[in-house]
Amino acid sequence: MVLGFTYTFVTKQGVFSEKKLAYSATTSNMEMISIEKAKELYESQSALFVDARHDFEYKMGHIRGAMNIALKEIDTHRIQLENISKEKMLIVYCDGVECNSSIELALKLMELKFTNVKVFFGGWQEWKAKKYPIDKE
């Protein structure tokens, strides 16, 4: 019980309080896309999906054809990124609405001069729930 009170005091939210988005979309000029738009772009093959999760999460399952660039490891992917056109549409995602790695990675990609970056904020959880194409390694 003491732990519960401590948690509530420190976080300013209760254990059973309503979940909030990890990152407010209004604080960024980032274009957020819906699951429907993500699926449309996936089917048209006009975009490269970029998974911002850790490598071990990516290996457990990811959107089919997605490239893994973990947010914390972006520097190790510089050569890979140099081989992608700066105009190529990149759809960045992470685990879901409680994960903001997709937004942070998208901002870093924009800093690297990629001009067509979008965020699929529903991410892996929403994609998997719809039973859309996935791969595992």
Give residue spans per PLM region.
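Short amphipathic alpha-helix with an adjacent loop that forms part of the alpha/beta core around
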Residues: 39-41, 75-87
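Mid-length scaffold segments of soluble, non-membrane domains
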Residues: 43, 48-72, 91-94
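Short beta->alpha connector loops
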Residues: 72-75, 98
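Catalytic cysteine-centered active loop of the rhodanese-like fold, especially the PTP/DSP P-loop
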Residues: 82-127
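Active-site neighborhoods of enzymes that stabilize oxyanions during catalysis
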Residues: 131-137
